Amino acid sequence: MTTNSKSLNLLQSLTCGICQNLFKDPNTLIPCGHAFCLDCLTTNASIKNCIQCKVEYTTYIPNHPLKQMIDCLDQSSNNNNSNNNSNGENTNNNNNIINNERSSFNGSNSNSIIGFIEGLSDSTSNGRRFSQQDGLRYSSGLLDGSNSGGSNNIRYCMEHYEHYYAFCNDCQAPVCPSCLLTTHNRHGMIPLTKDSIATKMKEYRDIVQSFKTKMSQYKDNITLYQKEIELLDSTFLQCKQSIQLMISNLHKVLKSRETYLLKEISSIHYASHMELTDRSSTLENEISEMEKLIGNGTDKFKDATEILNNQNLKFEFLEQFHHSRTQSKKNQNQDGLKPLFKTDLLFYKANNERVTEMINGTLGNISLLTFPLDDIGEVNIWDEPKENICIEKVRTNSNGIEEFEVKYGSLNKLIERLCLPNCYDDNYVNIFLLTYHSFCSSKKLLKKLIERFTIPEDLEAHGLTLASIHEIHMKIRSVLVKWINEYSPKFDQDTIHLFQNFNCRMQSEYTSIQEIENLLLNSNENSPSITSSQSLSSQSLYSQTNNNNNNNNNNSNNLQPTIQTNQTLSSNINNITISNLNNSNLTNNGTCKIQNSPPKNYQQSNYSSIFNGPSSSSSSSPSSPILSLNSLALINGNDNLVFESPLNSPRNNNNNNNNNSPRSSSFGASSALKFNSNNNSLNINSNMGGPYFPSPSSPTTNNIPNINHFSSRILSSSKNLEFNDIDEFEIAKQLTLIEFENFGRIKPIDLLTCVDLKHKTPHITNIMERFHNISTWVSTTIVRGENLKNRVKIVNKFIKIAEHLKNLNNFNSLTAILVAIQRSTVTKKDLVKQSVKIITDLEKLMSSDDSYSTYRTRLAQCSPPCVPYISIYLQDIMDLEKKNPSNIIVQTSSNKTQEFINFTRRSLISKVILDLASYQRFGYSTILPISNIQEYLNVHIDEL
C-alpha cells in the first residue's frame, strides 16, 4: 500500500494541474517553481497567479529534464502497447489487469518508477481495449468472472473505461486510477475488497430499510392528513353557512336601526328648527328694544349740552369737595379716621341733589365703579360662599396665639384671605405669592385684588365698617408692594396697564404706590423683562407722600401721631393712615411706633427678599428676585420678628427659640447686610460689631491663606496658568464664588416650572450643565496624566480640593468632583492613606442612602454661606407633586362635588423652596475674587 501511494504521488507530479494530463512541453513558473503545459499557460495568460500556490509569477522557462522524463514514459508506453498487440493478449481477462496493477503497486524496490508507470500505462491501454468488449456488460450491471474472488467482483469506470480501483469515502463513489489522479485526488479511499463491499452493502441496506420505514410512516401520515382535510372542509362549510346567517341577521338589525335613527334625526331637526325660529323671533324683539334704547341714548347725548353749560356748578362742587378733604386731613387726629374718597362722594350725593344729578350724568353711578372682569360667569370675590375654604388649627405658639393653616379653597377665598381685616398671616402671604403661578396668572390675581379693593354698596350685608374697609385697602396696598418688591414676577403689557389704571385710582383716593410707578417706568424704558426696580421700603413711600403733603398743606407736618399696637390690628387700626403706616418702625420691646423721620440705620436693601440675592445700594442697578420671610412684620404689628412658621426647614425645629441662629434670624437683623459688588456677596455692616457668621474653616488653616507665593503666576494671563501651579484651597474658593453666583440667580418660579426636568428654565439649566461640566473637567484632567504616577498626583490634588469645598459648604461642586473621581481609572489602592481616608469620608457624606440622610444632617448643622446640592431639592419637589394632587375634589352636598385648589401642596413645596432660598441670603464676603483663576476655571470647565 505504501508503494502504491508513492507511485501515485509520482504520477501526480508528472501531471499538469490545469489539463490533468501528462505534461506536454512543461514550463516552470518563476519564482514558485510549479510546472504546467505550455499550451495551458498560453491559454490562461490572463491569470498572473499560480494555479496551485496562488503566488504571482513573473515569467516561466522550459523544464527540459521533466520533458525528457515524459518523453521516456511515452516511448515506454508505446513499446508496451506494441508488445501486447503482437503477442495477441487481447483475450486476457480482467484478472490479468488487476494482477498487473497489484504487482505494480505492491512490487519490490527493484522495480523502477518508469516500469511502474509503464505497467500502469499497459493496464490502462488494456482497459480501454476491453472497454469495447465489456461495454454491454458494464451498462447492464453484470460482473466479470466469478463472484467468489475479491478482485473479480469489480466493475468499470464509465468515463475512463478502466476497472474500479477503490471507493472514495468523501464522494461515496467507486473510482478508477484515472479518477484517483484527477477529480478524486487526495480524497479518502477504501480498497474494493469483498469485506469492504459487504460492509457498504450492509450500510446501504440499513439505509434503504430506514427509508422504507419512513415511507410507511409518511403514507400513514398522508392518510391522517387526508382525513383531517376532509374534516376541515366540512367544518369550513358549516362556518361559512353560520357566517352567512349572521351577516343576514346583522343586515336586518342595521336596517331597522337605520330606520329608527332617521326618524330620530328628523324629529330632532324639526325640534331644533322650531327652537331656532323662536330664538330668531326673540332676537328680533330684543333688537327692536335695543333700537329704542339707542334712540333714548341719543336723546340723552343731546342733553349733554346742558351739562357743559353748568361748568360753574361743577367747579363749585369740586371746590367744596376739596375744601372738605383739606378740613378732614386737618381734623384726622380728632376724628380718628381719615375720610375716604368714596365716603365723601356718598355724603355729597345724599345732601345735594344737584351735585348728585351732575355726578350721575358725568361719572355715572358710584356703585358701578367696579373692575370689569374678562371671565364671564365668574363669581365676584364678595359673593363667594364662606364654606369654599378649609382652615384647620395647627398649634398655639408660645405667645398663646392660635395658628391656622389653609388646606384648600377656591381662588376667591384664597385671595380674600390675603387681605382679611383683623387677621394677617405673613406665612400665608409668602406661600401664596410664592406659588400662585401654579393655579393663577398675574393678571387674574391683580384683577381679583382690584375687585376686593372695590367695596360693594351694601356694607351691612357683608359686615363691613369704615375701619375694616380702610384696613382691607391698606392690606391690599401692602400685598401689592410685597408682590412687586420681593417676588418680582414678569408682567405682560396687559397687566402693566392694569397696574397703571389701578395706581391712578389709588392716587385719587389715597396716594399712588411708588413701586407701581417704578414698575411702569421700567416698562416704558423697554427693558427686556418687566421686573420691579430696586425695592423701596415703606419709608421711601413715606418720603414721597410726605413731600406731596408738604406742597399741598404746610400744616400737615405737625400732625404725626404715635400709636402703640399689639399682636394684631384691632381697635387702634382706625388711627393708622397710609402716611403714618409708611413711617412705622419696630421698637425694641416689639411694639409698632409711628415716627416722623425714617430710622437712622435704614438701608434700602433691607426689604430685599432672599430670592433676589445680594443687591447694590444703588437704585439704578436691577437685582434678581429674592424672598424676605418677615418683610410685612411692620404692617402685621407682630412683637416677635423671628420667622416661626410651618415653612421652616426641619433643621430649625429644634432651634426655634434660639434667636442667635443665623438660619432663624429676624428680618430686622438683616439690615446690617450690605452688598459687595466685587464678589456678588453680602458684607457685614460694621455696626454689627463683627462678622455675622464665622469664616469657613479649612483643613490647612482657619484663615485665608497668603497667596503671594504664587501671585506672580496668578497675576499673569490665565492662558499661562497650569492646574498644578494653583493652590488647592484657592481653586476651591474661586470655584465656590462662581457656583454661588449661579446659585443666587435661581428664582422661585424656576423651581415651580422645571421640576419635570423637561422644560427647565435657563437658571436651572445653567447650574445643571455646570455640574456636568465640572465633573467632565475633573475626569479630563485626570486622563491627561502621562502615566499612573501623574494621574495619582492629580487625583490627590482633587481630593484636597473636594475637602476644601466641604469646609466651604460648597456641596454642589463637591458632588461633581466625587462623581468624576469615582469613575476614574485610579483606584484607592494607588492613593496614599490620607487621601483614601478623606475620599471615604466624603463618599459617606454625599451617599444617597436613606435619601441623603448624612448630607441632610450636615446641611442642617452648617452655618451659611452655603451652596447646597441642587438636584436633591428638585427631586423633593417632584416627589411632593407626585404625592399631592394640584386640586382636590370635595363633596359639598349629597349629589354635588366641587374642585378646590390644594393649598397644602403649595405649602409643602414652599417649604423646600424657602429652605433652598435661605442659603441665598448670605454670600462668601470673606473670599477675595481672583479674576485670572476664575477665568482659568471658566475656560477649562465651559469648553467641555
UniProtKB/Swiss-Prot annotation:
Listed Low complexity bias regions: 605-623, 648-670
Keyword terms of this UniProt record: Coiled coil, Guanine-nucleotide releasing factor, Metal-binding, Zinc, Zinc-finger
Zn finger spans (RING-type): 16-54
Bias type Polar residues, positions: 590-604
Stretches annotated zinc finger (B box-type): 152-192
Matches recorded under Pfam families: RasGEF, RasGEF_N, zf-B_box, zf-RING_UBOX
Coiled-coil residue windows: 200-234, 271-303
Residues involved in Zn(2+) binding: C157, H160, C179, H184
InterPro entries in the cross-refs: Ras-like_GEF (IPR008937), Ras-like_Gua-exchang_fac_N (IPR000651), Ras_GEF_dom_sf (IPR023578), RASGEF_cat_dom (IPR001895), RASGEF_cat_dom_sf (IPR036964), Znf-RING_euk (IPR027370), Znf_B-box (IPR000315), Znf_RING (IPR001841)
GO molecular function: guanyl-nucleotide exchange factor activity; zinc ion binding
Region Disordered: start-end pairs: 80-102, 530-562, 587-623, 644-670
Keyword Coiled coil in record: yes
N-terminal Ras-GEF domain segment(s): 402-528
Domain Ras-GEF: 727-944
Gene Ontology cellular-component terms listed: plasma membrane
PANTHER family documented for this protein: GUANINE NUCLEOTIDE EXCHANGE FACTOR (PTHR23113), RAS GUANINE NUCLEOTIDE EXCHANGE FACTOR O (PTHR23113:SF347)
Known function: Promotes the exchange of Ras-bound GDP by GTP.
Name of the molecule in the record: Ras guanine nucleotide exchange factor O
Organismal lineage: Eukaryota, Amoebozoa, Evosea, Eumycetozoa, Dictyostelia
Encoding gene (name): gefO
